Amino acid sequence: DSAKHCGLFVGTVKANPKAFNLDDFLTTKTYELNEIKWEVAGMPSVFSQDALDLGTHLLLQHLPQNIKNDVLDFACGAGVIAAFVGVRHLHTFPDPNNRPNLHLVLSDIHALSLYCAQKTLHLNNLQGDVVASNGLSNVEGKFSHIITNPPFHKGINTDYSIAHSFLVQAREHLIEQGHLTLVANSFLNYAVDMEEHVGPCQKLISDNKFAVYQAVGIRPKAGHNKYKQRK
């Protein structure tokens, strides 16, 4: 068009085309953090398909060590977070007879992300449930920990409503004293919504680009309306 926003190409296939196989576009990357190595399946348009993004890297560095029981990786993308948690759990507790229970649930709205997430679990010999869900609409049960690098884009457009709706509903999916840990760009002050809708919130760490927040799923005390920053 005149604004050079798009172009149209027309061609004719003369040879017999190869049958479409989704796995032809699948890639596998090895990530490493704090002596933990894990495999991640990727595909075009899937978040973190090429490398561990800086925000998720900061989040994983500051996750609690005692994550167990039911864990939700919300907006999981390729399953980077859940796979790290699962592999670290196996590394921390090598004896299966003395290993605490860990049940991973991975949710996303994006079909290719869900496909990659399932592949990522398989690559790391992990068990988990991969759930197609618009926000938390199809996610069932309550979790001891919800972990996320929530999206704030829909396509190429900025959309803060995704994270806001998630935070409004998150406490209903946490057990009492359950934890919600997320990373966000520093200019996105999710702590206010976390404090209001989830429970007492603190900033675990921040740099010049990202901040990691953690909230505890209880009702705040009267007058408690300011998140705490760890000293």
Which role fits each region the language model picked out?
Residues 164-176:
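A short glycine-rich, Lys/Arg-flanked "PGG" loop and its adjoining helix->strand segment in the class I
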Residues 1-4, 41-43, 200-208:
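Conserved S-adenosyl-L-methionine
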Residues 7-28, 206-231:
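Core SAM-dependent methyltransferase catalytic element
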Residues 54-148:
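Conserved SAM/SAH cofactor-binding pocket of Class I
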Residues 145-157:
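A short SAM/SAH-binding and catalytic strip from SAM-dependent methyltransferases
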Residues 185-198:
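Conserved class I S-adenosyl-L-methionine
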Residues 4-68:
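SAM-dependent Rossmann-like transferase core, predominantly class I methyltransferases
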Residues 177-184:
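Conserved beta-strand signature within the Rossmann-like core of class I S-adenosyl-L-methionine
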